Amino acid sequence: MSRKASEDVEYTLRSLSSLMGERRRRQPEPGAPGGERSLLAAESAASLQGAELERAARRQFQRDETPAFVYAAAAFSALGGFLFGYDTGVVSGAMLLLRRQMRLGAMWQELLVSGAVGAAAVAALAGGALNGALGRRSAILLASALCTVGSAVLAAAANKETLLAGRLVVGLGIGIASMTVPVYIAEVSPPNLRGRLVTINTLFITGGQFFASVVDGAFSYLQKDGWRYMLGLAAIPAVIQFLGFLFLPESPRWLIQKGQTQKARRILSQMRGNQTIDEEYDSIRNSIEEEEKEATAAGPIICRMLSYPPTRRALVVGCGLQMFQQLSGINTIMYYSATILQMSGVEDDRLAIWLASITAFTNFIFTLVGVWLVEKVGRRKLTFGSLAGTTVALIILALGFLLSAQVSPRVTFRPTTPSDQNTTCTGYSYCNECMLDPDCGFCYKINGSAVIDSSCVPVNKASTTEAAWGRCDNETKFKAEGAHWAYSFCPTPYSWTALVGLVLYLVFFAPGMGPMPWTVNSEIYPLWARSTGNACSAGINWIFNVLVSLTFLHTAEYLTYYGAFFLYAGFAAVGLLFVYGCLPETKGKKLEEIESLFDHRLCSCGAADSDEGRYIEYIRVKGSNYHLSDNDASDVE
């Protein structure tokens, strides 16, 4: 500690001692009402040891003294979140160009969208063993290298098979990053900033999604090679992260676990600036020693986690949060935002892409709100409020699609079906019925605001941009004749309701349910189980991500568009009950203290918020424990 810092601490100690002495002089006489307790409080304060006073003073003095190095480490780490957001968001706009140029059918579109997600799920499940063996830093370097290679393959792809290979490589990279980055940030951050810095990762995810939507819009005017720029630009942040991590240190906790104690002390001291690290270092080392004693039993870590009640409960909470994040429909919204807007009646592809960027921007801005709220409101309240608002927004979105369905245009023109064609499409009477069949499209003309000469006909199997036969079987011809072709949407005056619903959804989702599952999972596991716990929860996130993204179009087909969003609202409501009953508050607690929150049965751990405002709750007075009042605690602190 510097000379100036030492003088400041000594001054703070003198001030605190004076304050304690003044408090003792102000105590009532023993015979006065409350005198017995006041005397005991005075004796309690007098019995505090100098070391306790010094720790209290250092906490007060050092609270805001965090080196810029910690923020730099968090920022370079969070570039993994940016890649996560960019690579999962950019495919939405790129697909509109790819399906035209490479004439992709529905199956190949689904493969390219979900291929990266599936690979990420596999990588996330294996990532626990990977970053436990190689270290957090090496795992992040590997992730950024994979993203760089995958992006280059995508930019140079000449066919759909190469595109799929590139998406798989990118998926492996973002899967490793998805569960390693939050752990690294949590382990290098001081307790008072941990939640905020981990939330920065989610801020970068949403920033990546917003940037991807802007890139999609900008390059949507390049019909031939625009998708190459969209998919290839992800290599730039991947290279920056790789170069940055060549100069960043390994996690001190991982180094201590591997026996590299001197290096760990040096790095921990560098990351804590003017703060003394002895207490934190001893706490980490002691927890590791205890965990290593418990780990002497044979068997995989996941088996030990499941057999040990506190970690089993933590795993249920962590995986449950990730599951409900996906079941509430977030990646349906993000992957299919342009498609959802088209479903609501937006005809032009470019307009749908630019409108989708509004939703991505909303997600980004309100994630910033979450960064500000996480250490003020706490994890539990923020998650609960976010999920409650998300449920309401999904209901509003569903009602908007229901309203559009109620005014769906009728089929007024039934062309003669060629003898070799299926007649299923021509049998539908309304546009919304036609749209729910993936083999059909809606051909129509517009007179003022009225839809006229409308028919439901089979879609061209080689391209969804035109019909298999009839007036709309040639895009150039039907546009010249004033006709319109709609696939997966119906013309409606209520298309604005979908945009409002999407924006409202992200206003509520982004501050809480977006970052909190990752933040909570980075905190709730003991060190010996942290990598495996985060790998399992990230894997659950990706698995349900795949399930929801692969089934959305089929769900909309069988349940209707509004039925699909009512279903997601139901899942979100169940998640609300889960958060209320099972999620404890971890705000302001050391990572080594959080395990005790799961000592009790699962659905009582979130029954009440913790009193995190007091550092000293009990002191020893003449051989017995005395509970300090709030005022006592504030005086000591």
Swiss-Prot record:
Name of the gene this protein is made from: Slc2a13
Cytoplasmic topology ranges: 1-65, 136-137, 189-201, 250-313, 374-382, 519-538, 584-637
Glycosylation sites: N422, N447, N474
NCBIfam families: SP
Name assigned to this protein: Proton myo-inositol cotransporter
Modification Phosphoserine, positions: S6, S44, S47, S629, S634
Gene Ontology CC annotations of this record: astrocyte end-foot; cell body; cytoplasm; growth cone; intracellular membrane-bounded organelle; organelle membrane; plasma membrane
Family: Belongs to the major facilitator superfamily. Sugar transporter (TC 2.A.1.1) family.
Membrane topology category: Multi-pass membrane protein
Keyword tags: Cell membrane, Glycoprotein, Membrane, Phosphoprotein, Transmembrane, Transmembrane helix, Transport
Residue spans crossing the bilayer: 66-86, 115-135, 138-158, 168-188, 202-222, 229-249, 314-334, 353-373, 383-403, 498-518, 539-559, 563-583
Originating organism: Mus musculus
Organism domain of life: Eukaryota
Ranges in the topological domain labelled Extracellular: 87-114, 159-167, 223-228, 335-352, 404-497, 560-562
